[in-house]
Amino acid sequence: MQLNSTEISDLIKQRIEQFEVVSEARNEGTIVSVTDGIIRIHGLADCMQGEMIELPGNRYAIALNLERDSIGAVVMGPYADLTEGVKVYTTGRILEVPVGPGLLGRVVNTLGAPIDGKGALDNDGFEPVEKIAPGVIERKSVDEPVQTGYKSIDAMIPVGRGQRELIIGDRQTGKTALAIDAIINQKGTGVKCVYVAIGQKASTIANVVRKLEEHGALANTIVVVASASESAALQYLAPFAGCTMGEYFRDRGENALIVYDDLSKQAVAYRQISLLLKRPPGREAYPGDVFYLHSRLLERASRVNAEYVEKFTNGEVKGTTGSLTALPIIETQGGDVSAFVPTNVISITDGQIFLETDLFNSGIRPAVNAGISVSRVGGAAQTKIVKKLGGGIRLALAQYRELAAFSQFASDLDDATRAQLEHGERVTELMKQKQYAPMSVAEMSLSLFAAEKGFLQDIEIAKIMDFEAALLSYANSTYAELVAQINETGNYNAEIEAQLKELLTKFKSTQTW
C-alpha cells in the first residue's frame, strides 16, 4: 500500500496529538545507591549546595556533591532502611537550628533537638548553621578580658573578648578541664557560654554537664552534643550549629564564649564524609578544603562594633559591642604540633595554649608550656594589675627552665644563679592550681605580688600551696574591701601596692600556714 504525502503528514499530526509529555518534577529525585550514610540521588535538577533533602520518616540529608547527573548527599541520622528507588524531595532550605536565651541551661543535639529530658525548647526562631563571618569594617579590636580563673593563663597568655585562643596538647593533658573551668569562671559575669562536644563518649559528656550544674554554670551555658555514636555528618556540623547559637548573643550586643571540644574529631568526621563522597584525598588523606572547614568556622568568632549591633537589632540596642570568643581544642599525637590539622588551626587562631604531657605527669597542672604558648592579641585586653604583676612570671619561668637544664651539668653554681633557680622553682610551684578552683583577679594579683616582690623566698617549696591558700583566706576575711576594690577596678597604683605589702607583711607575721 502506498501512502501519499498528505496522508503521511496527517498521520504524523495524529501521532503528535496522541503523544503525552510526562512532566517530571524537578524537585523530586530517586536514590540510586546507599553506602555508609552517603546517598547518591538521580534527578533533583534544582538542588542547591548544602540544601536539605527530605527523606521518608521525617529525616533529612544534606547535598554536598552536585555532579552532572547525580547528587551526593549525607544522611543526618539512621540510614539502614533507605534503599534504591526511594523517592526524595528538595526543600529549598538550608540547615537551620533553634537559637535564643531559652536554650541556656539545656543539652541539645546538632539539629537543636533537646536530649536532656527537660521538655521542649523555648527558642527565639531559627538561624542557618552556615553564615558568613563579619567583615573587617564591622569588627572592633579586642580590648576587654575574658578571665579564665587560671593564674598561669591570665598572667602569661591572656584571652580577650572576641579572640580565638587554641588549646592544644596530647590526650590526658587537661585540655577539657581548662575549658570547663573557663566556662565556670564566667558565672556571674553575664558572658553566655556554648560547649560543643564532638565525638566524645556519652558518659564523658554527662560528667561535664553534671560538673557545670554542680558549680552553677549550666544556667548560662548551652551544651551541643554530637557523641561518638552519632553519624559523621552530625559530628561535622555540630561546631557550626553551636557557633550559630553563640552568634545570636554576639549580634545583640552581648558577650559569648564557645568551646569546641575538639576540632580534631570534626576534621576526622569531615575526612570520612569526603572520602565516601569520592573527593580526592590530600595530605594525611584529609580533603583539600579542611583548612577552609576550620577557617570559616573560627572567623565567625569576633568582636563586632556598636554600629553592627545597632544595624542588626534595627536600633533596639545602641552603643554596645558584641563578642564571641572561641576556645577551640586540638588533640595532638605525641606532641606533634607540625601535623596537618594542628598547623592549620594554629595559623587561623590568635594564639595557642600548649599543654605538655611531661609537665602534667610531673604534677604541674595546668601543664602550660610557657615557652611556646602565646596570645597574639590578649595583651591589649589584660587587666592592668595582672599585666603589671604578671610581667616577670613568664621571664622567671623561661630563665628557670634554661638554668635548670644547665645546672644539671655544672657542679658549683654562683649565688646569683642559685637565687634565680630557687625563685623559678617557687614561681613554678605557685603556678599550680586545682581543677574547679578558679581565682578572682584580686586573688591572682595577690599571689603574683607575693612572687614578684620576694615574699616567697623564705617559704619552703613544699609549703607554697598551703601558704597561698592561707594567704587568700586571710585576705578575703581581713582585707575584704581591698579585694573588692581590685576585683571591681583592676587598677594598680602606689596606694594599692602599699596595701598589698602591708597585707603580706601582717600575714607572714601570723605564721598560720
From Swiss-Prot:
It is found in: Cell inner membrane. Produces ATP from ADP in the presence of a proton gradient across the membrane. The alpha chain is a regulatory subunit. GO terms for cellular component: plasma membrane; proton-transporting ATP synthase complex. It comes from Pseudoalteromonas translucida (strain TAC 125). GO terms for molecular function: ADP binding; ATP binding; proton-transporting ATP synthase activity, rotational mechanism. ATP binds at residues 169-176. Disulfide bonds: none annotated. It is a peripheral membrane protein. Its main location: membrane. Transmembrane segments: none annotated. The record marks 373 as: Required for activity. Pfam families: ATP-synt_ab (PF00006), ATP-synt_ab_C (PF00306), ATP-synt_ab_N (PF02874). It catalyses: ATP + H2O + 4 H(+)(in) = ADP + phosphate + 5 H(+)(out). The keyword Cytoplasm does not apply. Its EC number is 7.1.2.2. This is ATP synthase subunit alpha. Belongs to the ATPase alpha/beta chains family.
